[in-house]
């Protein structure tokens, strides 16, 4: 349901723009133009950085976001990490309460989860970093993992800003179900299920076994082009066109 602030904003709006169809549907009763625009991506992520990996025979999988958030599907994420000891999982984002932002708290389950990540020999925790450092780090990855519990997720698995940042690298993305990309298997691989991530570990394993094909030059080009078409400057131009 819409909050009071959202209702008040809609009453005075001449135009409603959102990154998800689901949000636009909530405003169906308001008779003003409505437009869907995807998340944008900054030039930092579209820039090409030199590859600095020294272990090219080892697969590196990236994950970015506040690791203290309760809507991460922690059991599934830890299962995937445990089942793939030869893969390095690099995580960017807060994992200490003092560095956290909205949506994270150091309760017992969260501490247990973070401790498991810290103890895992194939996990690297970079913590919160500046945008340019994150962008450069993501470009070193071979694949990306998104693993949220849709039932707890504040966006309910509709769209995530980080997807565009991952797409900008061209590398394959394995994710929980995301409605905004439900018909774009060329951009993101995801299970069909919306109520659980039970099939995500197997999808991850299958993708990694065939990572060369998923990261072919053609596939990488498709992902990069999609991200480039959603750069912030183009999104601003699109919004200006609606006004």
What are these regions (language model features)?
Residues 93, 103-138:
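Nucleotide-activated donor-binding/catalytic signature segment of Leloir-type glycosyltransferases, i.e.
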Residues 132-137, 145-167, 174-185:
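Nucleotide-sugar-dependent
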Residues 17, 54-72, 77-81, 89-92, ...:
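Conserved donor-binding/catalytic core segment of Leloir-type glycosyltransferases
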Residues 195, 202, 212-243:
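A charged, aromatic-enriched C-terminal amphipathic alpha-helix characteristic of glycosyltransferases
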Residues 1-16:
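Membrane-proximal helix-turn-helix segments that form the acceptor-binding/catalytic region
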């Amino acid at each position: 349901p819409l909050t009071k602030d959202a209702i008040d904003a809609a009453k005075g709006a001449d135009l409603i723009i959102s990154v998800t169809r689901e949000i636009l549907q909530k405003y169906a009763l308001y008779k003003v133009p409505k437009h869907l625009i995807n998340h944008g991506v900054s030039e930092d992520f579209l820039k090409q950085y030199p590859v600095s990996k020294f272990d090219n025979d080892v697969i590196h999988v990236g994950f970015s976001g506040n690791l203290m958030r309760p809507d991460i599907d922690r059991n599934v994420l830890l299962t995937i990490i445990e089942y793939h000891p030869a893969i390095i999982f690099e995580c960017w984002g807060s994992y200490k309460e003092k560095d956290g932002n909205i949506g994270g708290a150091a309760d017992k389950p969260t501490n247990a989860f973070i401790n498991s990540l810290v103890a895992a020999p194939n996990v690297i925790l970079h913590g919160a970093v500046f945008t340019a450092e994150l962008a450069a780090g993501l470009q070193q990855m071979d694949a990306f993992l998104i693993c949220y519990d849709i039932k707890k997720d504040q966006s309910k698995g509709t769209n995530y800003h980080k997807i565009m940042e991952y797409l900008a690298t061209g590398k394959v993305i394995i994710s929980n179900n995301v409605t905004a990309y439900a018909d774009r298997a060329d951009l993101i691989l995801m299970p069909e299920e919306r109520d659980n991530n039970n099939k995500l570990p197997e999808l991850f394993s299958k993708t990694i076994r065939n990572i060369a094909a998923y990261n072919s030059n053609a596939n990488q080009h498709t992902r990069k082009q999609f991200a480039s078409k959603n750069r912030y400057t183009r999104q601003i131009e699109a919004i200006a066109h609606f006004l």
